[in-house]
């Protein structure tokens, strides 16, 4: 149960950052507090934290997928993950976006509006970095590819940076397989009921079904390819909500498993013969492809950091983006690193700080990080 609840907590942290924790201070912590500005721009709440000893650099932070609206109250201390940027002298600007869910379309515009507002109020930063977690990694890549004259570099943390149709179709394929093995546990897949929420109760119901049929659960896990049965219930619960939200967003069904051959499980023949097949509606599928399909035209350094045991956004999926930049001739501007952990976006604040230091050194001194494990702290 703790691991299932942990994934829900991780999703919350990805969306808005967790509350500051005194047990995990930055090694570079400032003694002077930052000034905080909050407000609303075109329906999107925002927050700007400006350190007292500002170095005139800016980090535009992109939060991840949010089921409920993100709150950015000025009275709360900045999340320890983001405090790493402040403690290095950078201002942090974060938008709550004007929509929840797969708000890639809105997030790009909302963050750009906030960045422009920051410049009007505080002057043009000497350099601007993009950074984000999960879906925020998607927005980080989009920002770097579309505005290389604006951003000096980017940091993608557990980012969903492969093509969205590839990522999201895989999520749907898992649900269709789950429905085959565990009929009646979920509601309809097309359309997903609008009132469904990925709560602890829904997770518990799915987890109980998995526990009752361990062979079927193992087959499902092999299809998914990452994590374990303890986290699979959380993944199914979240994916079911995500699929419904995207159906409502696109005013149709963007998902297709009609031509998919499931592999990896022992009973693949029976599954492929018996699973219910669905075809996507063209306009709905086109929306997902538009938001987003990376071009690979990466003209600024991008460091991606992933945890090897991420059950929600598999670490292997980031290689799709590595191939995109390779095809476009910009492979020198992309580096993938990892930490050997299980969970979605379970980096410590210090790990985020070290990754950001690597990115800054890459931009400032042309010290390209080495692909592989995140280097340990210097002693």
Model-predicted regions and their roles:
Residues 160-293:
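Accessory cap/linker subdomain of secreted extracellular hydrolases
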Residues 304-306:
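Short beta-strand/loop motif that positions the catalytic acidic residue
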Residues 24-54, 274-277:
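N-terminal cap/lid segment of alpha/beta-hydrolase-fold proteins
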Residues 56-65:
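Short beta-strand element of the alpha/beta-hydrolase
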Residues 311-317:
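Conserved alpha/beta-hydrolase "acid-adjacent" motif
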Residues 127-182:
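Primarily recognizes the serine-hydrolase "nucleophile elbow" in alpha/beta-hydrolase
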Residues 333-348, 360:
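Histidine-bearing beta->alpha loop at or near hydrolase active sites
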Residues 53-54, 113-134, 150:
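Gly/Ser-rich "nucleophile elbow"/oxyanion-hole loop immediately N-terminal to the catalytic nucleophile
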């Amino acid at each position: 149960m703790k691991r299932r609840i942990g994934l829900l907590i991780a999703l919350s942290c990805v969306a808005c950052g967790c509350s500051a924790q005194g047990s995990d201070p930055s090694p570079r912590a400032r003694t002077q507090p930052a000034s905080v500005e909050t407000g609303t721009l075109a329906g999107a709440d925002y927050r700007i934290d400006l350190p007292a000893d500002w170095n005139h650099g800016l980090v535009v932070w992109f939060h991840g997928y949010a089921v409920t609206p993100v709150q950015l109250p000025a009275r709360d201390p900045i999340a320890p993950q983001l405090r790493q940027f402040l403690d290095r002298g950078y201002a942090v600007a974060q938008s709550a976006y004007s929509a929840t869910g797969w708000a890639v379309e809105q997030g790009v515009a909302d963050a750009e509006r906030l960045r422009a507002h920051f410049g009007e109020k505080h002057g043009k930063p000497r350099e601007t970095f993009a950074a984000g977690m999960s879906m925020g990694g998607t927005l980080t890549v989009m920002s770097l590819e579309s505005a290389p004259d604006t951003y000096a570099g980017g940091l993608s943390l557990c980012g969903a940076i492969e093509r969205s149709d590839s990522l999201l179709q895989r999520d749907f394929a898992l649900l269709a397989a789950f429905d085959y093995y565990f009929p009646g546990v979920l509601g309809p897949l097309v359309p997903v009921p609008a009132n469904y929420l990925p709560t602890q109760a829904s997770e518990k119901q799915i987890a109980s079904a998995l526990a009752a049929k361990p062979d079927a659960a193992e087959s499902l896990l092999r299809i998914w390819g990452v994590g374990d049965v303890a986290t699979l219930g959380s993944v199914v619960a979240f994916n079911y909500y995500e699929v419904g939200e995207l159906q409502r967003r696109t005013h149709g069904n963007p998902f297709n498993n009609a031509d998919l051959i499931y592999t990896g499980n022992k009973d693949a023949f029976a599954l492929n013969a018996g699973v219910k097949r669905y075809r996507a509606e063209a306009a709905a599928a086109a929306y997902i492809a538009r938001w987003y399909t990376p071009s690979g035209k990466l003209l600024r350094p991008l460091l991606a950091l992933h945890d090897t045991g991420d059950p929600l956004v598999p670490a292997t999926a980031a290689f799709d983006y590595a191939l995109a930049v390779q095809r476009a001739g910009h492979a020198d501007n992309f580096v993938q690193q990892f930490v050997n952990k299980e969970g979605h976006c379970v980096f410590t604040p210090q790990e985020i700080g070290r990754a950001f230091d690597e990115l800054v050194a890459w931009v400032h001194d042309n010290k390209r990080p080495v692909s592989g494990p995140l280097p340990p702290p210097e002693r």
